[in-house]
Swiss-Prot record:
HAMAP family: Thymidylate_kinase. Its EC number is 2.7.4.9. Its cofactor is Mg(2+). This is Thymidylate kinase. It catalyses: dTMP + ATP = dTDP + ADP. Residues 146-170 are annotated as: LID. It is an enzyme of class 2 (transferase). Belongs to the thymidylate kinase family. The gene is dtymk. Homodimer. The keyword GTP-binding does not apply. Catalyzes the phosphorylation of thymidine monophosphate (dTMP) to thymidine diphosphate (dTDP), the immediate precursor for the DNA building block dTTP, with ATP as the preferred phosphoryl donor in the presence of Mg(2+). It comes from the Eukaryota. One of its GO terms (molecular function) is UMP/dUMP kinase activity.
Length: 222
């Protein structure tokens, strides 16, 4: 008779550990895209783990193309309808995000639900209404909030190229982030430093936490 009993620990070694959902948030031009790429490279090349980067809004989808036209000042739209479009853009990615995570791929994301809520609430839309649209989406495991004054962000290259890149509006967004969204589970990163200093801090946090997060279940936004 063939012995099919597995040795203790063998099943754990062969089981695929889930991927991590890592998110970068912050006002415009604080360096999110740069740090997304840096951490993606670190996870892939140093930790040797499968990794994919995403960005919201995803402007490649039909919904994303409508959003892009708005952001480029090509169209106008009711603010509540626009918020629902942004939220729908995240919902249409839900299944692919969960599939990647369950198959062991780490996802590093530039903006997500919190950004959508902050921007819409900064226009005066009810915060709770904005957030309700996001409930049920996959919840990030690690959130890096890149902190920089709105004034300093305006000094960076290409600032002002899109509809929302206005100083007073960015100040409102920052206030909503820090008063209603950022909590003790977010990693607040001082973005007024060199790219390498920021990258090293973020990579160090990931390295110290990813193994324990792999053993947890994927949560939902509530």
């Amino acid at each position: 008779m063939i012995n099919t009993k597995k040795e203790e620990g063998e099943e754990e070694k062969t089981m695929i550990k889930r991927g991590l959902f890592i998110l970068f948030e912050g006002v415009d031009r604080v360096g999110k895209s740069t740090q997304v790429q840096s951490l993606t490279n670190h996870i892939s090349n140093v930790q040797k783990l499968p990794t994919k980067s995403l960005r919201f809004p995803d402007r490649t989808t039909p919904i994303g193309q409508i959003i892009n036209q708005y952001l480029q000042n090509a169209t106008n739209m009711d603010d509540r309808a626009l918020h629902l479009l942004f939220s729908s853009n995240r919902w249409e990615a839900r299944d692919s995000i969960l599939e990647l995570l369950n198959n062991g791929t780490n996802i590093v994301v530039d903006r997500y639900s919190y950004s959508g809520v902050a921007y819409s609430a900064a226009k005066g839309i009810d915060f709770d209404w904005c957030y309700a649209c996001e409930k049920g989406l996959p919840k990030p495991d690690l959130i890096f909030y890149l902190s920089m004054s709105s004034e300093d962000a305006t000094k960076r290259g290409e600032y002002g190229g899109e509809r929302y890149e206005k100083l007073e509006f960015q100040k409102k967004i920052k206030q909503i982030y820090e008063e209603k969204l950022v909590d003790d589970q977010w990693k607040i990163i001082n973005a007024n430093r060199s790219i390498d200093e920021i990258s090293n801090e973020i990579s160090s946090i990931f390295d110290s936490e990813f193994k324990k997060i792999q053993l947890t279940s994927i949560a939902k936004l509530e």
